[in-house]
């Protein structure tokens, strides 16, 4: 990747279009870094709402908020890097807030936005679907979220393989025991040899 290329040749991240109007007004790298920082810190809103929904005290909420703000993986990267993964935490927190408070239409909208972050973000949405299905006993909704996430994952990988430089599955090499099966082998490894 030592050359100019479209981000969509490597990752499927349509969530970046949310930032486009602001970047159009101020087309500078600093704009993207500031917007990214605002996105990350905005995760405090669903986090505080979640703590309130679970009945935590104000000191407990403050403690969770401080942990979120000072966790290096969240805020540290905002000082030097622009990356789509910074959208994950805030959107997942909104999904969980809407899920836990029974606002399922808003949860579905948040889950759809989550799918737009990156080609592998459907893994998180699929886990939310499993949580809905197994723990919340929302069988139909959980199945829809899980299956839609799996379908989107397949479509996103197909898109990158067809129109981009191909999915970067080499990060899963430790899990792929049979190279002929590709990613399917990863699931076999997880089931047969999870350690």
Can you name each region flagged by the protein language model?
Residues 3-28, 189, 193:
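Short hydrophobic/aromatic helix or loop-helix immediately within or flanking a transmembrane segment
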Residues 7-8, 19-20, 32-39, 64, ...:
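Alpha-helical transmembrane segments of multi-pass integral membrane proteins
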Residues 25-26, 38, 54, 70-74, ...:
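Transmembrane helix irregularities
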Residues 28-31, 54-62, 101-107, 137-141:
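Membrane-helix interface segments
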Residues 30-56, 94:
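Transmembrane-helix motifs of polytopic, lipid-linked glycan transferases
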Residues 46-50, 66-78, 86-111, 129:
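Specific aromatic-rich, kink-prone transmembrane helix
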Residues 106-116, 120-134, 141-148:
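Transmembrane-embedded, aromatic-rich helix segments that form part
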Residues 138-195:
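Membrane-lumen/periplasm interface segments of specific transmembrane helices
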